[in-house]
From Swiss-Prot:
It comes from the Eukaryota. It comes from Zea mays. Gene3D superfamilies: Farnesyl Diphosphate Synthase. The keyword Chloroplast applies. Keywords: Carotenoid biosynthesis, Chloroplast, Isoprene biosynthesis, Plastid, Transferase, Transit peptide. This is Phytoene synthase 3, chloroplastic. The gene is PSY3.
Length: 426
């Protein structure tokens, strides 16, 4: 079990008095002062700890308790109820969150440098552990983060670990024991992280991260909302419903990450455009996951496909649950793959505008996930009995291609020339 020997005091949280903008939205990472809780004697659990019954782990990652605090109420981009008289389309609802985060990030100058801050032993160990987790579960992404500055790299690791722990709550070994109440407690714990009161060492790394960077809490809340949706929903009537789910569980990651990765000072793109690209990459990745895992999800009684589009293609739940690869299924899958690729194309626009040292991880993710769609096609659209995966050799070949794409300069007068230069190589 990984733990520190004393309370983690983040220089960014405890020493800095940083306010990104006087107009920053409420409950964002706008810190004037922070307090840290002390470790509970005897290793007792905090009120906001989230554990499955009979287990000392949170998902698959275990860390020792530090303490907790009451949560503050917050808004949530909740899924519409079936009886709502007027339902705002999911894309519009998500766009409001994008605008909120973009406005917060725009208040911090793109030319501002994230200066190195000495870390005490406890916080250094916390970030090191986050790096270990990232290396274990996302080897390719971990490798790509090595080009980033240490401050940005460690912050991305901290965000990755929090997202993984959150996902493990409903998709990990203890998922059958997780309830909506447990997710409520996890959200309370999130509030404490943003308030500078981490519960364990992994929380401390994220608490330090949100104190250093203009990160909005809303995407984190929304990811937890996606976990709630997974507990109670196994069908999606339309792509509008599926879009909201994909935003919750994956699009949020892009919105969390851009403030850390940073937008290139040379970029002429609007901040909102970059965030839309990050959102699109998250949506594309999740849609790809869904198309890859159709058979696996069906065996769990879940269908993450638009019901109305299945019906228009002449397909039913029974066809999916029985795993029938028919001409109708192939036609349906072609349309779903085309949609995912459209999101990948939109993601490219945002990836080019990031800081140069941050582009390689993003391009690596984009190119690798897009290859999964190629593998589904190569399997003749049989994603029931054959799981599409990218062979290791292709993954390794994608990394230098991603690196070359990362060298394309942001939107400027020389962008077209730069793209032509590298297009023949990638």
């Amino acid at each position: 079990m990984m733990s520190t020997s004393r309370a983690v005091k983040s220089p960014a949280c405890a020493a800095r008095r940083r306010q990104w903008s006087a107009d920053a939205p409420n409950r964002t990472a706008t810190f004037l002062a922070c307090r840290h809780g002390r470790r509970l004697g005897g290793g007792g659990g905090a009120p906001c700890s989230v554990r499955a019954e009979g287990s000392n782990t949170i998902g698959c990652l275990e860390a020792e308790a530090w303490g907790g605090a009451p949560a503050l109420p917050g808004l949530r981009v909740a899924a519409p109820s079936p009886g709502d008289a007027f339902v705002v389309p999911s894309e519009q609802r998500v766009h409001e969150v994008v605008l909120r985060q973009a406005a917060l990030a725009a208040a911090a100058p793109r030319t501002a440098r994230i200066e190195p801050v000495p870390l005490d032993g406890g916080l250094k160990a916390a970030f090191h552990r986050c790096g270990e987790v990232c290396r274990e579960y996302a080897k390719t992404f971990y490798l790509a983060t090595q080009l980033m500055t240490p401050e940005r790299r460690m912050a991305i690791w901290a965000i990755y670990v929090w997202c993984r722990r959150t996902d493990e709550l409903v998709d990990g070994p203890n998922a059958s024991h997780i309830s909506a109440l447990a997710l409520d407690r996890w959200e309370s714990r999130l509030e404490d992280i943003f308030a500078g009161r981490p519960y364990d060492m992994l929380d401390a790394a994220l608490s330090d991260t949100v104190a250093r960077f203009p990160v909005d809490i809303q995407p984190f809340r929304d990811m937890i909302e996606g976990m709630r949706m997974d507990l109670k929903k196994s069908r999606y009537r339309s792509f509008d419903e599926l879009y909201l789910y994909c935003y919750y569980v994956a699009g949020t990651v892009g919105l969390m990450s851009v403030p850390v990765m940073g937008i290139s000072p040379a970029s002429r793109a609007a901040t909102e455009t970059v965030y839309k690209g990050a959102l699109a990459l998250g949506l594309a990745n999740q849609l790809t996951n869904i198309l890859r895992d159709v058979g696996e999800d069906a065996r769990r009684g879940r269908i993450y496909l638009p019901q109305d589009e299945l019906e228009m293609a002449g397909l039913s739940d029974a066809d999916v649950l029985d795993g029938r690869v028919t001409d109708e299924w192939r036609g349906f899958m072609r349309g779903q793959i085309a949609r995912a690729r459209a999101f990948f194309r939109q993601a490219e626009e945002g990836a080019t505008e990031l800081n140069q040292e941050s582009r390689w991880p993003v391009w690596s993710s984009l190119l690798l996930y897009r290859q999964i769609l190629d593998e589904i096609e190569a399997n003749d659209y049989d994603n029931f009995t054959r799981r599409a995966y990218v062979p290791k050799t292709k993954k390794l070949m994608a990394l230098p291609k991603a690196y070359l794409r990362s060298l394309v300069v942001p939107s400027s007068s020389s962008q077209a020339e730069s793209r032509r230069r590298y297009s023949t190589l990638t």
